[in-house]
Each structure stands twice: as C-alpha cells, then as structure tokens.
Amino acid sequence: QPSGRLALNLRWIILGLMFLALFAGFQGGRYYLANRLQELGIASALTLFMLGAWRGLFLLPVVEWRRWVMGPVLLVGGIMLVSATVFSLQYDGRFLYSFFSAREFLLAFLGPGLYLLCRTGLPVDDVRKVVWFTVFALMVNYLWFFMTMDLSAAFFSSDHTVSNLVTYDQWRGFRLKPPLFAIMVGLLGALMMVFQARGFRHFVFALAVLALAGYIWSIVQFRATLATILLALLVYPIFLRQISRLKMLLVLSPLMIMSLPVAADHALQTFLLAEGGGIRARAFMAAFDYLESHWLFGAGEDSAYGDSYQDIVAPYFYPSDIGLVGTAFKYGIIGLILYLWMHGKIGFALWRANLSFRDRMGFHDPLLWALLLFMTAQTFNLVLNPGLAYAQGITLGTLALALARFELTQSAPAK
C-alpha cells in the first residue's frame, strides 16, 4: 500500500478545495451570484485531480494510475467533445459555447482526485469529515436563504437563473429548491449514525442533521423522493444486506421484470397527470419524434448563448423534465447506454464496499451506507429522474465511486 504523507499545510488546502468542490457541486451556491460559485467548485475539483495525478505518478502502479487518470479524462472529455460537436454540426452552433455549457461534467474529476490523494497519503477519515461538514453547511445555507429570500419575487423574476430557484403549486405554495441529493444522503447517514453512535458528539451531530433534514423536507415535501427512500430502506435488509440475500433477488428477478410494464405505466400516468403533465406529454412526443432520425448521438449540448432546445424544439421543451427520454434526446442511444452503465457501476461498487467495510470493521460506514441507499432509491426512479446526468448527481456519483473503490482497496489482500 502506498504510504506517502501529506504536509500539514497542503492537507488543509486539499480539504478546503474539497469543501468548495462539494458545496458548489451540490448546488449550494445557486442562490447567489447566478451560481458563479460552480465555476470555483469546478476549478477546485480540477486542482484536486491534477494534484492527485501528480502524486500518484510517483507512488502508484502504472495500471492503477492510468485507470484513474486517463480513464476519467477520456470519459469526461469524450462526453463534452462529442455532445458539443454533434450540436454544432446539426444546428450550426458555436462549438465552444456548447463545450463550456457542458462544463458541469468537469465536477466528475473530484472523485478520481480524492481517490488518488487517499491512495497516496490523505486520510480517508478526513474526507468523510469534510463530506459531513459540507452536508451540514448546505442545510444551514438552504435554510438561511429560505428564510431571507422573497420567494414570490424570485419566482416571477425575469432572470431565469433567479426564477428557476423557486417552484410553486397551490398545495405547497412557494418553495425554494434545495440541494436535494446532499440532504437525502445526510438524512440517511444520520439515521445510521444514531443507531450506531460511537460517542456523544457523533450522536448529537446525527440528531442535528436529522432535525435539519426533517425540517427541510417539511418545506419541500417531495413525496416521490420520500417514497423511493422508504422503498430503498425496505429493500436493503431483504436483498442487499448480505451476499446470500442477493440470490433471492436473482430468483425473484423474472417476476420483477414481468411487473415492470405495469409499474412503468403507473409511474408514467402519475408523471403525466401531475401538474404540468400535458406539457410533459407534448415534450415526450417531441423527443420521440426527434430520436427517430437522430437516435445514435441525439441533439448534443445546447447553450445559453446560441440556439437552445427551446428554440429548436418548443418553448416548453426541457430534456431534464422527461427523464431517461431526455437523456436519450441529448446524448442518443450511446449516451443512454453509457449513463445506465455508470449508474450500475456506481451502485455495484457501493454495495461491495458496504459489505467490505462491515466485514472489516464490524459496523457500517454511515456515509457509504447512505450513498448506497440513495443510489438504490435513484434506481427506482431512474426512468423519470436520471439525476446523475446533472451537477448534483455528477458530484454524488463521482464521490460515491471514489469512496467505494478506495474501501475495496483497503480490504483487498496485499500482493
């Protein structure tokens, strides 16, 4: 195992960069400066990646270094280059506009950077502490803006970056959109902390996170998210807690596959009959019509400085509102397959890492467990909400894969 040590001053710089990347990636800065904090988060993620790549070059095996340096460069670079090229060729758009419009994918470099740094001396416990501190800061940040922002004025603002922060319906009124992924992971992890608290401070912190997350949910009341979380909590002890339980899942898989059309039809009807369902139905039809002739690479990545999807398709058309169909619209069948592969890869790595940590330490890692449960919940809602294709999901996915892979290296037999 590599045993390089980080100087104290460099360690604190790394942890600070990690906080910025996570806070911005989970969209904590979207409430001010038109989310310009995201650019700082991207720069922080790239800095961590370059530093990890530099240290790994001297301390890691060549095969491992290539996998965690060249692999992410080819994957992220390929997504950005291909999607920008496709859009610019089909609609005479500016390549650079589309390329930089996809810059949120650069947040994916955070995970490889953290993995490489942990493999070359950064204590993984420091990473966990920064993640929990960031989750807590995101919750406090959200509540501050919820209590101080004029939500009605923001909702009717002519500035799209401001109006997009608030949603409204007659039942729940005006609601400020939260950093949902981080809050749900915090809620799940805090639950595990309460049940296996390893000290008074951990117990108090877990209760504080639970209280904040519960209060935020009482504001936003995202029922579909809560339903999938509860379903994931039910599935975990039945199918995912032990390797032997997975055999039961394999036995039941034919029945589950047979029930998919019924479940999908019910979910689709609920999706379309909800508020705005008529617009979603037209958006679905427009996407399917487009994919008939552009099924391989899709439409590519649009930008705010040229023709957008609303100019090309319809004013009401937003791919992010129509689930996996929207992903296929943007990136084609190739992008859709790549998305499903990455989703499965992250989920499987988290499952293995959770078993590994529990077998090695005798208890659960609350963060790994929470990430596994959230990915399981995302799987149930995958068709309608492919969240890993956007900033919050990219940040969560890359962090989850890095932590899971690092845990698996800890449990691997020494060569």
Q: Which residues fall in each region the model found?
A:
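Transmembrane signal-anchor hairpin modules in multi-pass inner-membrane enzymes, especially those
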Residues: 1-85, 122-125, 195-201, 352, ...
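Aromatic-anchored transmembrane helix interface
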Residues: 68-81, 92-117, 129-135, 139
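Transmembrane alpha-helices of multi-pass inner-membrane enzymes
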Residues: 370-415
